[in-house]
Amino acid sequence: MIYKSFLRPILFSLEPEYAHNLCLGLLSHPFYPFFHKLLASFQKDLPLLPKELWGMQFPNPVGLAAGFDKNGVGLRAWESFGFGFVEIGTVTPLPQEGNPAPRLCRLPKEGALWNSLGFPSQGAQRVAERLKKVFLSGRPKIPVGINIGKNRHTPLEETIEDYKKCFSYFKDLGDFFVVNVSSPNTPGLKSLQQKRFLELLFDRLNPLNSSPRKPLLVKIAPDIELKNLAGILEVLLRNESVGIVIANTLPAKGPGGKEGGLSGKPLRELSLGLIRFVKKETAGRLPIIGVGGIFSSKDAFEKMEAGADLIEIFTGFVYNGPSFPANLCRELERLRKTPQCSAIFLQD
């Protein structure tokens, strides 16, 4: 309540990207250890909702979606909020500024955010160095995923080299990896949501991905053609330790008719439909992370009922505040104890 009645109005009075970076800056500030302890005290009654995927333990199924902490600056904080895992990035091989401003705006009536960020990134080398420094004092207690992408000016025919470079930097740092081929804000990127490209990508990444093999997931767009999705699923099912993230932002025009993508409630039904499709097409053999429009435990449970093994939040976190992930876990624990919902949590 404090967030919605006091903090959110203050933050929403600020330019969106400035407010976002301000919050991330606070999480990396020298006084953060005190803040960390304060947050942790709020999570003492956080229930355990363990999930095992790819031989990896997730303390709960609620994760932070890619795009929120693009450079891993708040990595130590996320478990304090009650997240069961975090996906940082999208990280590109070389540093890049992304698209020009304005490139982020809030749409409160729609329960949405619009962005045209275009993968602003400090680059793989700098982000990897930051993670190494953080890990010197011990790895986080939650799995850390790395979302990797291509630089804007890399020709499409050289895209695989960009993914290889990123993967090589983070191979020993990330617990799992997500290949972003679906952002609407990088020219031509969505055209890579094709069976043939994914075959070539896995052929080039698999030799680098061993001892131990790290899970490699593909993030798809909410408006992907089902025939293309079916081809992607074929490729994924032929490989080991794979998965799919459903879904990225929905292409939409923003201020001044600028091209960008919507996240939040407008994605809810599209994401659910794709999750159900993938679950059916793969007979439940492919791990799914469901993203898009999760603002309540009902939304979260719908994703899991449709077939998602894990869920991620972003826009709902912005609108509901820092207590949202922990509250989601508490509500999911309550649902788990009800006869009509318990079967969903026992599918393992």
UniProtKB/Swiss-Prot annotation:
GO terms under biological process: 'de novo' pyrimidine nucleobase biosynthetic process; 'de novo' UMP biosynthetic process
Query: Which reactions appear under catalytic activity for this entry?
Result: (S)-dihydroorotate + a quinone = orotate + a quinol
GO CC terms: cytoplasm; plasma membrane
Keyword vocabulary terms for this entry? Cell membrane, Flavoprotein, FMN, Membrane, Oxidoreductase, Pyrimidine biosynthesis
Catalytic site residues? S183
Q: Which cofactor does it need?
A: FMN
Cofactor, free-text remark: Binds 1 FMN per subunit.
Which residues participate in FMN binding? A66, G67, F68, D69, K70, T90, N147, N180, K219, A247, G264, G293, F314, T315
To which pathway does this protein belong? Answer: Pyrimidine metabolism; UMP biosynthesis via de novo pathway; orotate from (S)-dihydroorotate (quinone route): step 1/1
Query: What is the protein's membrane topology class?
Result: Peripheral membrane protein
Q: What Gene3D superfamilies does the database record attribute to this sequence?
A: Aldolase class I
Q: What GO MF annotations does this protein's record show?
A: dihydroorotate dehydrogenase (quinone) activity
Per UniProt, substrate binds at K70, N115, S116, L117, G118, F119, N180, N185, N248, T249
Question: Which family does the record claim for this protein?
Answer: Belongs to the dihydroorotate dehydrogenase family. Type 2 subfamily.
Q: What does this protein do?
A: Catalyzes the conversion of dihydroorotate to orotate with quinone as electron acceptor.
Full protein name? Dihydroorotate dehydrogenase (quinone)
- Source species of the chain: Methylacidiphilum infernorum (isolate V4) (Methylokorus infernorum (strain V4))
